[in-house]
Amino acid sequence: WAAVQAVWDHFESYRPQIAEKERRVYGKEPEWVAPQPFTVTTTDGTSVQLRGGYYPIKYDPAASQRAEEHADAESAKRQLQGAYTTATTRRSFTKARAEEVSGRPLLYTLGGLYSGVNDVIHDLAWHEWLIDANRLLRSHTIDQAIREHYGPEAKQQFKTWAADIAEGE
């Protein structure tokens, strides 16, 4: 149980950096999920008090059609993002939690841990840079200069580069 609490504490250690970045970008902190303390009784009868914490839930796309459809929709959304909107990082860890989710079985692997930590670090490293890069790429003056001096292929490469960074590739 110490390992479980250590994982929650690790996610909690990012909170100050996430809060600071979200205040800079959006003017406010995310609606944090409040930890729910609880007690577990081990097989030897010992009671262990845990503080609780955040863990990124992942749904098993192979376990139900609804979960598979949601995974497909998320993938399509990410692929279209660079074409119709500005490229950005994944930030599910800043979103409010749903009260109830049905028909989407959980994925019982450590994938949530690995992808969750990766998403947080990637967002902290690149989100603000992507905002600035996308602002530059949308500038008509810069667009015209790139196209005139280097051609439309160069402009497309910059857009692809930003989209790849946003995706984490």
What are these model-derived regions, one by one?
Residues W1-E169:
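Structural preference for well-ordered, secondary-structure-rich domains
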